[in-house]
Every structure is written in C-alpha cells, then in structure tokens.
Regions:
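Acidic two-metal-ion nuclease catalytic site recognized across multiple nuclease folds
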Residues: 77, 81-142
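Mg2+-dependent endonuclease catalytic cores in nucleic-acid-processing enzymes, primarily RNase H-like
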Residues: 1-92, 136-142
Length: 142
C-alpha cells in the first residue's frame, strides 16, 4: 500500500478496519498517516445507518454527478449494482447485508466496497511537498 501511495501520490489512504488492522499497524510504524475505517461504525451523515451505507451513498452521488468506472470492469459494475438500499424502521438508509446478498445468489461486493472506501471522508489535496494545501494568505478581520 505504501508503494502505491507513493507511486500515485495519494492524498489519503483509508483502510478497512475489518481486515486491515495489521496493515495499518505496519503503515503506522513506517510513519504513514493512514486511517482505519469501521464499515459498521457511525456514519458521517445521520441519514445513513452506518459507515458502509454512507460510503456507498457517497459513491452513488459521485457516479450520478459524472464519476465513472472502467467500462471493461464487469466485476466492479456487478458489485455496484448488486446490493439493495433499504430504509430501516427508524428511517435510516441501510445497505443490504452480505448474508442477504448471498441468499439471493450474489457474491460479496469486494471491489464495490473497495471503491466505496475511497468515499469514507473528504480529502484535502496535498501540495507537491506532501503537505496539505492551505490558504497562502493571513486572515485579519481588523
């Protein structure tokens, strides 16, 4: 992951807490500022039941606004259209469970989850030096 982060000059790296804690620990030892994301954790938006539903919702909006996936990646396409959205009894948007998908004969949407993970939080672009870009002027209201 560190090699890809450097090669593609990633502005952020999000790691699935479910399977990535070991990788995260190694990255931390290497001085990386990666973030663990708990798919079942609290959503950034109260409309969504959990973080997984939130990330998939953000991905859906991105696609609706013109984001695209490689046209020849049928597996990713199938993953994205596989899980259904459900409204729970409290009015939260919830993504269909992987167990329910399996009961319908669908595989776990691993590639879809990986793409959705990129929507876990807003990312501030780094400058060429690797630092976060901030305003280059001081603000003085007086």
């Amino acid at each position: 992951i560190a090699q890809f982060e450097d090669e593609y000059k990633a502005d952020a790296v999000f790691i699935d807490m479910g399977y990535g804690t070991g990788i995260y620990s190694i990255g931390k030892q290497l001085g990386r500022k990666w973030r663990l994301i708990e798919f079942g954790g609290k959503s950034n938006d109260p409309v969504y039941l959990n973080m997984r539903a939130y990330m998939w919702g953000q991905m859906k909006e991105w696609l609706r606004e013109g984001g695209s996936i490689p046209p020849n990646d049928q597996a990713l396409y199938d993953d994205i259209v596989g899980p259904e959205s459900i409204i729970d009894k409290n009015g939260h948007i919830q993504l269909e469970s992987k167990k329910d998908m399996k009961d319908r004969g669908l595989p776990s949407p691993n590639k879809g989850d990986a793409l959705a993970l990129t929507f876990a939080a807003r990312v501030v672009k780094k400058s060429e030096t690797g630092n976060r870009i901030v305003a280059n002027t001081s603000y003085n209201p007086f």
